[in-house]
UniProtKB/Swiss-Prot annotation:
Contains mostly 4-hydroxyproline. Proline residues at the third position of the tripeptide repeating unit (G-X-Y) are hydroxylated in some or all of the chains. Residues 1-21, 127-139, 585-597, 740-750, 785-800, 917-932 have a biased composition (Pro residues). These protein fragments were extracted from an ancient tibia bone collected in Haiti. GO terms for cellular component: extracellular region. This is Collagen alpha-1(I) chain. Residues 110-125, 173-212, 351-370, 412-441, 529-543, 556-583, 612-628, 657-666, 678-690, 752-767, 821-835, 856-899 have a biased composition (Low complexity). The keyword Phosphoprotein applies. Coiled coil: none annotated. The lineage of its organism: Eukaryota, Metazoa, Chordata, Craniata, Vertebrata. The modification Phosphoserine is found at residues 89, 532. The modification 4-hydroxyproline is found at residues 15, 18, 21, 30, 44, 59, 65, 74, 80, 110, 128, 137, 140, 167, 170, 182, 188, 197, 203, 206, 221, 230, 233, 243, 258, 264, 273, 279, 297, 306, 312, 318, 327, 330, 334, 343, 349, 361, 370, 379, 382, 400, 418, 424, 430, 436, 448, 457, 469, 475, 484, 502, 517, 523, 544, 550, 553, 562, 568, 586, 595, 604, 616, 622, 631, 640, 643, 664, 673, 681, 690, 708, 717, 720, 726, 741, 747, 753, 762, 768, 788, 791, 794, 863, 866, 884, 899, 905, 920, 923, 926, 929, 932. Residues 47-61, 836-850 have a biased composition (Basic and acidic residues). Type I collagen is a member of group I collagen (fibrillar forming collagen).
Length: 932
């Protein structure tokens, strides 16, 4: 059957989401043919669809910086290449499906409770209460006689303790403590809601017309009609009249019914195996069958491996007491030394003693040996998200890495599609000064004037200033390329330019790999001795040591007559302890016992002497955020972040200066062949003869700055890398000068919108709190090695050094001749983002083009400016509770709080004992007269 004509093209589909970036292709070998003349500029092409972005490569290890290469010889200028063809626009991709919803993780077990905190400081005395109202005046008493002074009364008993007052108002908030250590990664969040259904795709093209069916058989003949009756005889034949008008075309007859079904055709070919079906649901469990008969015993299995040693049996019942034996013969005097007795079991811990009276600080103790480094604690729960820190200053440009080894030449890939029209190149060097123009025509001679009287010669005038520069001559013809001259001496460094304006805060770079530990710094001053840690429990009993060597034999006793078997003698008194045997090898370390009760914190003693440097401690918790270091190598690209809100369109910024050209990038791997049918190869054109070099062209105008790409979406925050071993304190380096900005890369491809990310890592650690006042002196702990101490709190960050002044910008030297192409260098750092251009007018919608070949993936553009922070994701389930932290140092006495509200009146106190009789008071005023 012949396929029908192709139907009209459907409406243009909606644009699909951008694909993942494709791998970077290798650079092909240069062609052998001569380079043709540069063609005229074609019309501006339409932007093709974004190609699929490649998977991010693994960042390579940073090699040591190589030596600086020698300056190459100047090469001859090459001829411009031919303009490439415009690529076909690709079809829109289909919309991707949303991934499955994640399973919520299990809830962690609650951690153990932490140790009791240190005893708080005694609160400051509250303000005095208000004065009560004055009582009514008493009646005037009669003047009493002066009494004698009575004996001094006994001291009254101490009154009961008053009711505890209401708590005062909260005092001012103390300084923020240091931020907690970064918690472990939370459990995966709950499954997200199903995404909205995708936009319906464009309608497909109409299918080709199917083949015509077979013609049905003819129907049976109809019945024969009846014969007509003979008609009446006709009249004479008339004259033929004129032909009538043509009648209308009759309607199409009804479609005939289909014929009978034809015979079945031959059996078709056997189909291939079908795809694997989905597993069916679990069937309903059937009824349990009757128990089967017991099988015959199987053959004896191989002999098993010997089992583990059994536990010691329980102690047997004590035996009957034996008969008292007769006293034995006296042993040698002195007897042999007995074995050292085993140490007794540790006694139960004593009751916790009451805190003693706060003693005076003891004398300054000798510097103790540094304790063993404690084991690294389990990461605590995630701390609260700190405030967003300010963007750090852009780090100095790192030294260029060494050139990588030359890669093996890859297989020649398929012919790629013609690339897009490149951006206009930078302005060429200024042309050579042209020859002076012809002199103008001589003017008409004027009338001779009258000769004046010659005056006296005047004094010599000052030297005239340089005249105005003449007009620029026409560019002269370019001479033949001369031989490269010898390498000139390196010029002197130009003067230091003026300090530039401070640049904008750069985007914080990805965390680079942990570098090797720096050189050991000078030992710092020994810090003040911290509070004594709690005394560890008595260690478990060690294994008994080896038996000591037997002592020398004693003198032999007199041989007595063999006595009869006497009764067993009474138990003798324990003998004297024998001589101590040689020290046996140390037994295995016993298990660490449970921590004992925490004693009261002792008063800090005086500052100890400067101790020797201890062994390197275990890995501490991450310190506070340091200064932004030089940018590390590119890390693995994180998953695409959620789409940020559309930013406001900013005004047109000032035109930036063109930065120096970056080093050419490394050759990437060859890209995969693109989709689509392979086009037929075109006919090779005849090679043109190399033309003579044309005249030096006038330097072209500077190209229009391209529109910057859309603002990139903020990616997920990377997982915090493992904390490396702390490097030794190295000497502070001198602040380097700020490097020149790199060239602006092409705009990067926008990634597909990702799912909402997990909660970001905790913020930087806050500044440490103020030192607390010394607590009361605690009880003296037991001697002996204590358990390993907890890791100390991170130290405060050191002061930031002064930023180095930017050097004065040197004057631009004359452009030298172009040198030969050097080896491909490492890719330079991303340049600053250019100003956002004006939004162009929307062009007319073009016709749908034929699906083109897959284009090469473009170079990765500079990272977009960070988008606005998206909404916080749902908080995950609480992680496992971390181990108890170490007791912090007691804080300083806080400021006196605000006076609290007046509490309710307390209970009435006991009436005090009668005090001593006081001295007689002064005579009162006379009373009023009595009634008559």
């Amino acid at each position: 059957s012949v396929p029908g004509p192709m139907g009209p093209s459907g409406p243009r589909g909606l644009p699909g989401p951008p694909g993942a970036p494709g791998p970077q292709g290798f650079q092909g070998p240069p062609g052998s043919g001569p380079m043709g003349p540069r063609g005229p500029p074609g019309p501006p092409g339409k932007n093709g669809d974004d190609g699929e972005a490649g998977k991010p490569g693994r960042p390579g290890e940073r090699g040591p910086p190589g030596p600086q290469g020698a300056r190459g010889l100047p090469g001859t200028a090459g001829l411009p290449g031919m303009k490439g063809h415009r690529g076909f626009s690709g079809l829109d991709g289909a919309k991707g499906q949303m991934g499955p919803r994640g399973i919520p993780g299990e809830r962690g077990r609650p951690g153990a409770s932490g140790p009791a905190g240190a005893r708080g400081n005694t609160g400051a005395a509250g303000p005095p209460g208000p004065t009560g109202p004055a009582g009514p005046p008493g009646f005037p008493g009669a003047v009493g006689a002066k009494g004698e002074a009575g004996p001094q009364g006994a001291r009254g008993s101490e009154g009961p303790q008053g009711v505890r007052g209401e708590p005062g108002p909260p005092g001012p908030a103390g300084a923020a403590g240091p931020a907690g250590n970064p918690g472990a990664d939370g459990q995966p969040g709950a499954k997200g809601a199903n995404g909205a259904p995708g936009i319906a795709g464009a309608p497909g093209f109409p299918g080709a017309r199917g083949p015509s069916g077979p013609q049905g058989p003819s129907g049976p003949p109809g019945p024969k009609g009846n014969s007509g009756e003979p008609g009446a005889p006709g009249g004479p034949t008339g004259i033929q009249g004129p032909p009538g008008p043509a009648g209308e075309e009759g309607k199409r007859g009804a479609r005939g019914e289909p014929g009978p079904t034809g015979l079945p055709g031959p059996p078709g070919e056997r189909g291939g195996p079908g795809s694997r079906g989905f597993p069916g649901a679990d069937g309903v469990a059937g009824p349990k069958g009757p128990a089967g008969e017991r099988g015959s015993p199987g053959p004896a299995g191989p002999k098993g491996s010997p089992g583990e040693a059994g536990r010691p049996g329980e102690a047997g019942l004590p035996g009957a007491k034996g008969l008292t034996g007769s006293p034995g013969s006296p042993g040698p005097d002195p007897g042999p030394a007995g074995q050292d007795g085993r140490p007794g079991p540790p006694g139960p811990p004593g009751a916790r003693g009451q805190a003693g009276v706060m003693g005076f600080p003891g004398p300054k103790g000798a510097a103790g040996e540094p304790g063993k480094a404690g084991e690294r604690g389990v990461p605590g729960p995630p701390g609260a998200v700190g405030p967003a820190g300010k963007d750090g200053e852009a780090g100095a440009q790192g030294p260029p890495g060494p050139a990588g080894p030359a890669g093996e030449r890859g297989e020649q890939g398929p012919a790629g599609s013609p690339g897009f029209q490149g951006l206009p190149g930078p302005a060429g060097p200024p042309g050579e000064a042209g020859a002076p123009g012809p002199s103008g025509a001589r003017g008409e001679r004027g009338f001779p004037g009258e000769r004046g009287v010659q005056g006296p010669p005047g004094p010599a005038g000052p030297r005239g200033s340089n005249g105005a520069p003449g007009l620029q001559g026409m560019p002269g013809e370019r001479g033949a390329a001369g031989l490269p001259g010898p390498k000139g001496d390196r010029g002197d460094a130009g003067p230091k330019g003026a300090d530039g304006a401070p640049g904008k805060d750069g985007v914080r770079g990805l965390t680079g790999p942990i570098g090797p530990p720096g050189p050991a710094g000078a030992p710092g001053d020994k810090g003040e001795s911290g509070p004594s840690g709690p005394a560890g429990p008595t260690g478990a009993r060690g294994a008994p040591g080896d038996r000591g060597e037997p002592g020398p034999p004693g003198p032999a006793g007199f041989a007595g007559p063999p006595g009869a078997d006497g009764q067993p003698g009474a138990k003798g008194e324990p003998g004297d302890a024998g001589a101590k045997g040689d020290a046996g090898p140390p037994g295995p370390a016993g298990p660490t016992g449970p921590p004992g009760p925490i004693g009261n914190l002792g008063a800090p003693g005086p500052k100890g002497a400067r101790g020797s440097a201890g062994p390197p401690g275990a890995t501490g918790f991450p310190g506070a955020a340091g200064r932004v270091g030089p940018p590390g190598p590119s890390g693995n690209a994180g998953p695409p972040g959620p789409p940020g809100p559309v930013g406001k369109e900013g005004g047109k910024g000032p035109r930036g200066e063109t930065g120096p050209a970056g080093r050419p990038g490394e050759v990437g791997p060859p890209g995969p062949p693109g989709p689509g049918e392979k086009g037929s190869p075109g006919a090779d054109g005849p090679a043109g003869a190399p033309g003579t070099p044309g005249p030096q062209g006038i330097s072209g105008q500077r190209g229009v700055v391209g529109l910057p790409g859309q603002r990139g979406e903020r990616g997920f925050p990377g997982l915090p890398g493992p904390s490396g071993e702390p490097g030794k304190q190295g000497p502070s380096g001198s602040s380097g000068e700020r490097g020149p900005p790199g060239p602006m890369g092409p705009p990067g491809l926008a990634g597909p919108p990702g799912e909402s990310g997990r909660e970001g890592s905790p913020g930087a650690e806050g500044s440490p709190g103020r030192d607390g006042s010394p607590g009361p002196k605690g009880d003296r702990g037991e001697t002996g090695p204590g358990p390993p101490g907890a890791p100390g709190a991170p130290g405060a960050p050191g002061p930031v050094g002064p930023a180095g002044k930017s050097g004065d910008r040197g004057e631009t030297g004359p452009a030298g001749p172009a040198g030969p192409a050097g080896p491909a260098g490492a890719r330079g750092p991303a340049g600053p983002q250019g100003p956002r251009g004006d939004k162009g007018e929307t062009g007319e919608q073009g016709d749908r083009g034929i699906k083109g070949h897959r284009g090469f993936s473009g170079l990765q553009g500079p990272p977009g400016s960070p988008g606005e922070q998206g909404p916080s994701g749902a908080s995950g389930p609480a992680g496992p509770r971390g181990p108890p932290g170490s007791a912090g140092s007691p804080g300083k006495d806080g400021l006196n709080g605000l006076p609290g509200p007046i509490g309710p009146p307390g209970p009435r106190g006991r009436t005090g004992d009668a005090g001593p009789v006081g001295p007689p008071g002064p005579p009162g005023p006379p009373g009023p007269p009595g009634p008559p």
